[in-house]
Amino acid sequence: MLKRIGKMAELFDDHSLLQLGASGQIDGQGFTLVGRLQYAYGEGDERGTWTEWHALQTDGSSAYLSEDNGAYVYSRPVSSNGAVPPASELPVGHSVALGGQRYVVSSNQPVTLIAAQGELPKLPPLGQPFTVVEVRSEGGDEASQRVLSFDYGSAPPAVTLGRGVVLTDLNMSGLKAESAQEGSGRQFACPNCGSPVTVKLAESKAITCPQCHTLIDLSKGIGGELRHAVQDEPVRPLIALGSVGQLNGIHWQVVGFQHRLGQSPDDDESFGWTEYLLYNAKRGFAFLVDAEDGWSLVRPTTGAPKVTGNGAKAEYAGATYSRTWSYNAETSYVLGEFYWPVRRGQKTFNRDYAVGERILSLEQTGSEQTWSAGAKLDFNQVARAFKLQDKAALFRRQDAAPVSLGDAGSTLIKIIVVMMLVLAGMWLLAAMFGASSSGSGSGWGRSSGGSFGGYSSGGGHK
């Protein structure tokens, strides 16, 4: 017997390619999207939303296709065997053993179901906050990375286990046509200056006005009241928004840009870097990071590296990374569209790691942490990718190799090296005989590891 269990807010149109009735295949089994849920997390300026699709599999069981840091996670319910720890015992960053596998807590925060549509399993309390905790598999290779979610909206808590997926790998059909997606009223007037603002991406949760650069929150859709913040001191991106470039064989479009400031906890000096949000319809999102010591391309990870040595080392995908920097970060300026509710003044604590050309970065708040992984890029490669070879000199950073000076230059370098060794020896002798020396200054720059650039949109549930 069906009965009315409450009244919900109307679903806001997130203009996703996904829709009810769309179908696909995973692990040799078909599925059809039959239900849609929208959740909210955070409060005030930190409020964000995500969408979760209920998938009915051909064997009659349920699964979920959910947003995850600009990508997707496909999750299935699993039995907890009564072993789910209380949410209070799962602080963010905590490592925990579950079912013989080690996980790291990536998110622990209250969420609220705000809207639902279609065929759905038992729903959490309507409009009432409940806690969702997400843990990500620790270490291992990329193919084995998993997301485990605990939904404390029911008793006992519901548990789902998922892995990262790409929509094109799911052989999906019945998706919204691109023309329908693009023509569905995605333009609105800027709440600050009245100029038209066009939203181009389905996943956007924040956007800036192209005229006055006001930052506008889209987390509640564009039909309601739009929260906004006027931005001063504009920062010009080196690569223009809308530019398309090919990096590592993949075509990316620049859809967002943010300038960030960092400061070591034991240092008064700050440093800055910029991050370009890149988008590919088949691959999702990535970050092109422009830092003092070079360029890098990074993407959020599904799992979490295994951190050892009191945070000094991180093991990921068969490699051991060493920590390069730890610092507080703050977003100072943004342009374009973003899939999370970015704002000026957002603060995180970051740690960067590196091994050779590969890099890892951890970004953490009180309720969430996000890992990203990638590699360094040559500045010429970045300039060529976006057809800016004539401006390549502007892309050069501290990691760039010196220009060849020929035989004479080689001799000069050898002389300089010898002089440096002599000076080092003199300094060592002076130190041995009681000479004192002062510590060096703080003229270091942020690693090019690339912090993720804001809050993630979650994992198995988000």
Label each region the model flagged.
Residues 1-18, 22-410:
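Short, surface-exposed polybasic-aromatic patches that bind anionic ligands, especially phosphate groups
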